[in-house]
């Protein structure tokens, strides 16, 4: 589920689709494993409109990928490295956890891979270090919000790593194992 779908306006949450899915699965002896998305791979914004303000640094950033056909728009990503934006995502996780944590099997946080390869300066406040720290803080927040559920961070690539040297990705794995 997209962040913006679960919190359509500031502090106004809509967990009905999640609760409905839980009920449907429970009727069949199953439990929900869900993903809360703060990233898209399209023009659709992942964050609530109120986050797209200056107070939140714009809330989300355009992602860019370099490929054989040049630099192309690749969707949007919440500013995970920004404490204000991360705080709102953490609040969403806490509130969602209060409602459904005991009734779900697990929660998955979206992939860590991102790129801002558009030939311009990176977004304000962004650095590989700040991004990695933001990912770790979100992982910890999810664990607190869903203490009895499996929490998975989809860690597939970290900006700033230059394979085979992957210190940022290894730091994410170490945090997950702690």
What kind of feature is each model-predicted range?
Residues 5-7, 40-47, 114-118, 160-162:
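Short catalytic/ligand-binding loop motif for oxyanion handling, primarily in non-cytosolic enzymes
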Residues 5-8, 75-85, 116-130:
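Surface-exposed cleft-lining segments at the edges of enzyme active sites
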Residues 16-18, 23, 39-95:
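Active-site-adjacent "subsite" loops/lids of carbohydrate-active enzymes
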Residues 25, 96, 142:
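Conserved, mostly hydrophobic/aromatic
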Residues 27-30, 147-149:
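A short helix->loop->beta-strand "cap" motif at the edges of active sites that frequently abuts
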Residues 104-116, 129, 133-166:
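Aromatic-lined carbohydrate-recognition surfaces of secreted/lumenal glycan-active proteins
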Residues 161-178:
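Glycine-rich, flexible loop motifs
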């Amino acid at each position: 589920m997209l962040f913006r779908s679960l919190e359509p306006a500031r502090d106004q949450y809509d967990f009905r689709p999640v609760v409905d899915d839980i009920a449907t699965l429970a009727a069949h002896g199953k439990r929900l494993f869900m993903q809360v998305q703060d990233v898209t791979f399209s023009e659709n914004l992942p964050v609530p409109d109120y986050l797209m303000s200056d107070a939140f640094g714009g809330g989300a950033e355009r992602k860019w990928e370099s490929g054989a056909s040049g630099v192309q728009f690749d969707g949007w990503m919440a500013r995970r490295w920004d404490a204000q934006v991360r705080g709102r995502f953490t609040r969403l996780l806490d509130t969602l956890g209060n409602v459904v944590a005991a009734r779900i099997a697990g929660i998955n946080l979206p992939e860590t891979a991102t790129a801002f390869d558009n030939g311009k300066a990176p977004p304000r406040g962004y650095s590989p270090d700040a991004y990695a720290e933001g990912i770790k803080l979100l992982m910890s927040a999810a664990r607190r919000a869903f203490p009895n559920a499996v929490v998975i961070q989809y860690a597939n690539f970290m900006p700033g790593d230059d394979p085979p040297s992957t210190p940022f990705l290894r730091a994410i794995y170490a945090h997950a194992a702690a």
